[in-house]
Amino acid sequence: MGDVKNFLYAWCGKRKMTPSYEIRAVGNKNRQKFMCEVRVEGYNYTGMGNSTNKKDAQSNAARDFVNYLVRINELKSEEVPAVGVAPPTPSATDSSDTTAEDGGVPGNLGGPLPPHLTLQAENNSGGGGSGYVPTWDRGANLKDYYSRKEEQEVQATLESEEVDLNAGLHGNWTLENAKARLNQYFQKEKIQGEYKYTQVGPDHNRSFIAEMTIYIKQIGRRIFAREHGSNKKLAAQSCALSLVRQLYHLGVIEPYSGLTKKKEGETVEPYKVNLSQDLEHQLQNIVQELNLEIVPIPEDPSVPVALNLGKLAQFEPSQRQNPVGVVPWSPPQSNWNPWTSSNIDEGPLAYATPEQISMDLKNELMYQLEQDRDLQAVLQERELLPVKKFESEILEAISQNPVVIIRGATGCGKTTQVPQFILDDCIQNDRAAECNIVVTQPRRISAVSVAERVAYERGEEPGKSCGYSVRFESILPRPHASIMFCTVGVLLRKLEAGIRGISHVIVDEIHERDINTDFLLVVLRDVVQAYPEVRIVLMSATIDTSMFCEYFFNCPIIEVYGRTFPVQEYFLEDCIQMTHFVPPPKDKKKKDKDDDGGEDDDANCNLICGDEYGAETRISMAQLNEKETPFELIEALLLYIETLNVPGAVLVFLPGWNLIYTMQKHLEMNPHFGSHRYQILPLHSQIPREEQRKVFDPVPSGVTKIILSTNIAETSITINDVVYVIDSCKQKVKLFTAHNNMTNYATVWASKTNLEQRKGRAGRVRPGFCFHLCSRARFERLETHMTPEMFRTPLHEIALSIKLLRLGGIGQFLAKAIEPPPLDAVIEAEHTLRELDALDANDELTPLGRILAKLPIEPRFGKMMIMGCIFYVGDAICTISAATCFPEPFISEGKRLGYIHRNFAGNRFSDHVALLSVFQAWDDARMGGEEAEIRFCEHKRLNMATLRMTWEAKVQLKEILINSGFPEECLLTQVFTNTGPDNNLDVVISLLAFGVYPNVCYHKEKRKILTTEGRNALIHKSSVNCPFSSQDMKYPSPFFVFGEKIRTRAISAKGMTLVTPLQLLLFASKKVQSDGQLVLVDDWIRLQISHEAAACITALRAAMEALVVEVTKQPGIISQLDPVNERMLNTIRQISRPSAAGINLMIGTTRYGDGPRPPKMARYDNGSGYRRGGSSYSGGGYGLGGYGTGGYGGGGGYGGRGGYSGGGYGGGSNSFRGSYVGGGGGVGGGGGGFRGLSRGGYRGMSGGDYRGESGGGYRGSGGFQRGGGRGGYGGGYFGQGRGGGGY
């Protein structure tokens, strides 16, 4: 194989060029591979190869590049050394050959040149379609913006009016001054600007969306803004702000030059920080050791000084990439597996020719068609699908055009059949080795269920000619002549290796317009211009596809007619009339203050009812609140359906998991629907696959299946036995407002397109019925389409993907989107990534940015996880990060959590610690098998599905970090205690403060808190910190960090964790100033702390950031840090202790005294405590050998014999980590250290190990959390026998 490398060198040498090879190791130490990329100047292609050794990886990369040169006619195939793989001859045709004869062969990867390719001369060998940009650059003229960018250096922090975290980026235009400037602009340009308002959410949680599009004649294009606010005024202000900021970045208007008159929020009293002398000395010493210069005390207190140090270490700026990149594509090749993105270096396929592969696969298929009776029966079923009549037309269009759109009604069979038409056509025409098809689906359940269906139709199990790949689960098909179904997100992650070895990309459900699909369409549009031989098939429901057709150069559209059976649809007034429904009397229960509705000035369409309906119907309809989902009416419809005596499943569309769960419980409580005659199944993306699968299973005769689903069942998945659809006409969307970092989950009206899709789900087996729970008048007012997700979500993650795939500038790339996002959102994303050190001075990915781009999590959490690895608490940080992707695991009857859930927080006053404790306890419980896991979740009222999904996500995050080179030791699972001192947990909370910044708040009284700049908010009712009643609460520290701000009628903070002021100074602040007496954090928190101490802590943050820079360049150094960095980490551990700031967490243990005593725990096996012997929550009660006798330090205390610090956490060796390894009794309990090799260590060999065999150890006698007798945590689960307490 080495010959091909020399061949490429020689070929380049003749042209005075040198191929440039870049090799990197991928995978972890145990199964390391080498990835090689080769580039040649002047060619917009990257050759790629990989192997278990560097030499073969280089040869494979050279081979890939040489095959590319053959495809573009720079080389003849017979000139290439023939070892290994010869490029497939049919696909090696000249890409510029326009002869009709070549194009006439179905599926030939040449074909006549489409008109758009005449534009390619401008694109410099197809670099991403800049020639076509004017048509689609609908957003902003980014060239002007980027050319002036250097002059307008951004100001990171600013003092602005309403909470505005980033006005300095946008010419200091804020909520307060933008609307007036927009009006001036309208007057000057004689524009009639009108806001279009939409109301979202129910009355008690109502908010508004304002949107506007304006034409800017100076630059000859339109700009668009769509923003959200809790009332019309705020929504309009936010919309005006987005428009003005875009005008500023386009150079149409000036920056704001007036003073931003600070609208004073509530002031926070100065907080006295009690710092010990010892810690101050320690801080000064470490700062000296690190050679950090701290800012001296200001001479004049009226002129405060900034304490923040600049960056101490920066990533070397990498070379700027070509202005426009394109994802590399190559046709299928014999020794390349496209599904694993790796070369096949071993086995028969490594040396098989394309002709051999094609012949073998054709023979296999022909034999199967002749011999398999079941397959013949399935083929007859397939013949009946409407799409079958269009097979030859579809194949002809795909053969002749790089892009084809197929539009077909729900259930016509396009999703399952089109990929099979292409595959079978290739196999039967001896071109099997040239065919690999990837099909994207918007959701995991659709990818898996469609793959399983296609495998069944082919008489196979998944993994042969058909497979799937979704997050957490893959069954990959064979490397040639196969179909892979995957989610769009999975395909985007695969693009890093290019679209290599794939002949056809099919994008299903393009009308959904999620951010990933829109992103993929931009990538594919560029790919198809650079590589016209690739085939792109876009599939959509029966909606207007003209926008997609125009976007893809007026490509052909094939219309597939024929839904199986007609569906009769009814609206709210019809439903009320046919069921004689009378709404129950309204609940007079007083609403909580923050849930109060206000004046509703949006028309109530339930008051509009045609004359053809009776008076009773009109009265009943007027009594129903449009914004709420009427459960009683759904019940009435279910009873009505029963009277029709037409068997079939009922599919009920509801917005969001909460309503599905509540509706399921509501129906199950009803003796009629809770009986064996009904099977009620939830369907939601967050429930496990095995639960999701149940909806496809047939039910016995006489049983009615009721499926309660979100819009997941709207597209792709087809549940064959559905005859009835009850449609709430709503859906839940996440709205994000960048200028104040506010998230809002709003229930909004679905679009007409959504309703059409939902209706189509009925009528698969017989004529169907669809009941829309909105009035005809409301239906007329619905939007035709939903707003694209790209307009209502932060763009940080997509921006990282653009850089990872080398697609050029973030803004320039997004300007090519089918509907580009507003320019101000793009600039926000770039700024955030620069601040995180993910982008360097040339706006290219840094080593840190490269890792963040690979983590499927918010970039800030990604950096927090890397810091967690440095402190050896990576596992806990991964758990918390994973948990943020899913709903809380608590099943709560009311809005507030009960004691059974609050107790998981121990005395840490933290929702995040509660999540960590729940996860830890569940992980322990499931060691006893599935039954123990189920019992534990039922007893603790926890959602087992959520916990399992969190585990999957955590494992995935850890694997990515390990594959990036982080040592496995820094990601080992640890046990935390939430009721006593635990320095590792202190560090986790410090890092969490970094991860959720700028979400910091200060507790005032009861539920009231102040957020950034002293704005009022409330503690969210689902928090462990939410008081039970109006009684006031005192917390050990008034400072909290929180996960997100949720806008209901008031603003509330969700996911709260108590922190100390030192943790804020260290990790949750951007601007720290001192006047010598007081320290001001982010312009609103005032701390009484010595200037020197504050300056030292702030300097440590800079030193920590510098360490992150070094670690991300070479993650392996974590296990061998130099002594100075070790001491710095130890100092940060000290600062993270609550006691370092004079805070005693023990004070608050009776904070829940305004309610009943916590219930006693039920027995599990022996004993009765939740954790080991005794009768209460903490083994022997809070008094007996728990907290009391022996206490933290003495015998029989908290940590087992010898107590928490007898023999000690630090005992034995000289540094922090020394205690893990040795010393008389560390965390591991009696004798032996955390990982001591004798007597009861964490993984001790003799006196009881991790799962102690012979008494003791982590869960054995005298183990981590218990003094005396046998049975530690599991008391017998893993110790000897099942004695002495435990579950």
UniProtKB/Swiss-Prot annotation:
<keyword id="KW-0508">mRNA splicing</keyword>
<feature type="domain" description="Helicase ATP-binding">
    <location>
        <begin position="395"/>
        <end position="561"/>
    </location>
</feature>
<dbReference type="InterPro" id="IPR001650">
    <property type="entry name" value="Helicase_C-like"/>
</dbReference>
<feature type="short sequence motif" description="Nuclear localization signal (NLS2)">
    <location>
        <begin position="1152"/>
        <end position="1170"/>
    </location>
</feature>
<feature type="region of interest" description="Disordered">
    <location>
        <begin position="1253"/>
        <end position="1287"/>
    </location>
</feature>
<dbReference type="GO" id="GO:0045142">
    <property type="term" value="F:triplex DNA binding"/>
</dbReference>
<dbReference type="GO" id="GO:0046872">
    <property type="term" value="F:metal ion binding"/>
</dbReference>
<dbReference type="GO" id="GO:0050684">
    <property type="term" value="P:regulation of mRNA processing"/>
</dbReference>
<dbReference type="GO" id="GO:0140640">
    <property type="term" value="F:catalytic activity, acting on a nucleic acid"/>
</dbReference>
<dbReference type="GO" id="GO:0006954">
    <property type="term" value="P:inflammatory response"/>
</dbReference>
<keyword id="KW-0597">Phosphoprotein</keyword>
<dbReference type="GO" id="GO:0070063">
    <property type="term" value="F:RNA polymerase binding"/>
</dbReference>
<dbReference type="InterPro" id="IPR044445">
    <property type="entry name" value="DHX9_DSRM_1"/>
</dbReference>
<feature type="region of interest" description="Necessary for interaction with H2AX">
    <location>
        <begin position="310"/>
        <end position="949"/>
    </location>
</feature>
<dbReference type="GO" id="GO:0070922">
    <property type="term" value="P:RISC complex assembly"/>
</dbReference>
<keyword id="KW-0539">Nucleus</keyword>
<feature type="region of interest" description="siRNA-binding">
    <location>
        <begin position="53"/>
        <end position="55"/>
    </location>
</feature>
<feature type="compositionally biased region" description="Low complexity">
    <location>
        <begin position="91"/>
        <end position="103"/>
    </location>
</feature>
<protein>
    <recommendedName>
        <fullName>ATP-dependent RNA helicase A</fullName>
        <ecNumber>3.6.4.13</ecNumber>
    </recommendedName>
</protein>
<dbReference type="GO" id="GO:0048146">
    <property type="term" value="P:positive regulation of fibroblast proliferation"/>
</dbReference>
<dbReference type="GO" id="GO:0005737">
    <property type="term" value="C:cytoplasm"/>
</dbReference>
<dbReference type="InterPro" id="IPR002464">
    <property type="entry name" value="DNA/RNA_helicase_DEAH_CS"/>
</dbReference>
<keyword id="KW-0347">Helicase</keyword>
<dbReference type="GO" id="GO:0045739">
    <property type="term" value="P:positive regulation of DNA repair"/>
</dbReference>
<feature type="short sequence motif" description="Nuclear localization signal (NLS1)">
    <location>
        <begin position="583"/>
        <end position="592"/>
    </location>
</feature>
<feature type="binding site">
    <location>
        <position position="509"/>
    </location>
    <ligand>
        <name>Mn(2+)</name>
    </ligand>
</feature>
<dbReference type="GO" id="GO:0051028">
    <property type="term" value="P:mRNA transport"/>
</dbReference>
<feature type="modified residue" description="N6-acetyllysine">
    <location>
        <position position="188"/>
    </location>
</feature>
<dbReference type="GO" id="GO:0048511">
    <property type="term" value="P:rhythmic process"/>
</dbReference>
<feature type="region of interest" description="HA2">
    <location>
        <begin position="828"/>
        <end position="916"/>
    </location>
</feature>
<keyword id="KW-0391">Immunity</keyword>
<dbReference type="GO" id="GO:1905172">
    <property type="term" value="F:RISC complex binding"/>
</dbReference>
<feature type="modified residue" description="N6-methyllysine; alternate">
    <location>
        <position position="143"/>
    </location>
</feature>
<keyword id="KW-0810">Translation regulation</keyword>
<dbReference type="GO" id="GO:0003697">
    <property type="term" value="F:single-stranded DNA binding"/>
</dbReference>
<dbReference type="InterPro" id="IPR044446">
    <property type="entry name" value="DHX9_DSRM_2"/>
</dbReference>
<dbReference type="GO" id="GO:0005730">
    <property type="term" value="C:nucleolus"/>
</dbReference>
<dbReference type="GO" id="GO:0051092">
    <property type="term" value="P:positive regulation of NF-kappaB transcription factor activity"/>
</dbReference>
<keyword id="KW-0832">Ubl conjugation</keyword>
<dbReference type="GO" id="GO:0005634">
    <property type="term" value="C:nucleus"/>
</dbReference>
<feature type="modified residue" description="Asymmetric dimethylarginine">
    <location>
        <position position="1259"/>
    </location>
</feature>
<keyword id="KW-0067">ATP-binding</keyword>
